[in-house]
């Protein structure tokens, strides 16, 4: 069916506008969102935001899609393996709303690149990266931005299987999450702390132990994980020696919960 972009957007937002009202829909459409990491959490967050009406979104990730991404990452399919993650996700988002402005940045967030992202230009910043060092740096920088810029962070989504244990909470009050604990310990050792409170999505479920073996290291081929993706590993290091299992039923809820925090915050603003 041949539908104009304007007609498509107007039609797709009827249910959103019916629930939230035209004024709130307009606020959502004007919001500028920056997402660091578009893997199992960030990809679902991005789609949920665009479907909810967000028109201006920047997605950041350095990796290409590999086979193992297909169990949990939105844009990862048999046809997209090998493609740049942010480009594949952009294609998906523009199919949903061709009027959206989706900026792709195929680069790593780290201390050396942080200034290049111009975070002060955005209304909302989402942390969906796994590297402990880079995550800590992003938290410190994002919470030091002006208070009108809202920062939301994802804690550990791997090694869980119960979707009903996913919660939101203030970073310093999170219990039972090893990644949050590792971050807090890192801040305490460095005696450098986030400048303000911020919300996180996390799970109250005790992390499981991997019940299987990493086939990439148990066979003749390591192509499964050849993309060099930032993956949650033992102690959140950059080593590929141990990769933790994860499920879409958890990572997707993390991403959609972050999107929900953002949409609700927009609606509640006066």
Could you say what each language-model-derived stretch is?
Residues 1-34:
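N-terminal charged helix/coil linker that caps or initiates catalytic domains
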Residues 35-37, 60:
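Conserved N-terminal Rossmann-fold NAD(P)-binding element of oxidoreductases
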Residues 51-56, 147-148:
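Conserved S-adenosyl-L-methionine
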Residues 68-75, 159-170:
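Acidic/polar active-site rim loop that often engages polyanionic ligands
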Residues 2-6, 120-124, 129-137, 149-151, ...:
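Glycine-rich phosphate/adenylate-binding loop
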Residues 105-114:
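Conserved SAM/SAH-binding loop
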Residues 54, 59-97:
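Glycine-rich phosphate-binding loop and adjoining beta1-alpha1-beta2 segment
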Residues 41:
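Hydrophobic/small residue at the entry helix of a nucleotide-binding pocket
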């Amino acid at each position: 069916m041949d539908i104009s972009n304007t007609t498509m957007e107007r039609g797709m937002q009827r249910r959103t506008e019916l629930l939230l009202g035209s004024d709130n829909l307009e606020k959502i459409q004007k919001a500028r969102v920056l997402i660091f990491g578009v893997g199992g959490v960030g990809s679902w967050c991005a789609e949920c935001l665009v479907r909810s009406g967000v028109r201006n979104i920047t997605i950041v990730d350095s990796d290409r899609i590999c086979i193992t991404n297909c169990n949990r990452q939105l844009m990862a399919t048999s046809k997209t393996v090998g493609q740049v993650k942010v480009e594949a996700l952009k294609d998906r988002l523009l199919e949903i709303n061709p009027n959206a402005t989706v900026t792709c940045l195929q680069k790593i967030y780290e201390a050396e690149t942080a200034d290049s992202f111009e975070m002060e230009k955005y209304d909302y910043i989402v942390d969906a990266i796994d590297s402990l060092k880079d995550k800590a740096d992003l938290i410190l920088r994002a919470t030091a931005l002006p208070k009108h810029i809202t920062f939301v962070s994802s804690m550990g989504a791997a090694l869980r299987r119960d979707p009903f244990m996913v919660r939101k909470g203030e970073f310093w009050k999170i219990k039972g999450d090893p990644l949050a604990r590792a971050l807090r310990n890192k801040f305490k050792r460095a005696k450098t702390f986030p400048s303000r409170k911020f919300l996180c999505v996390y799970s109250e479920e005790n992390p499981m132990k991997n019940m299987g073996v990493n086939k990439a290291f148990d066979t003749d081929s390591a192509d499964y994980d050849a993309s060099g993706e930032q993956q949650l590993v033992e102690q959140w290091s950059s080593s590929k020696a141990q990769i933790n299992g994860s499920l879409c039923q958890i990572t997707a809820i993390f991403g959609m919960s972050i999107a929900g925090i953002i949409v609700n915050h927009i609606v509640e603003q006066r």
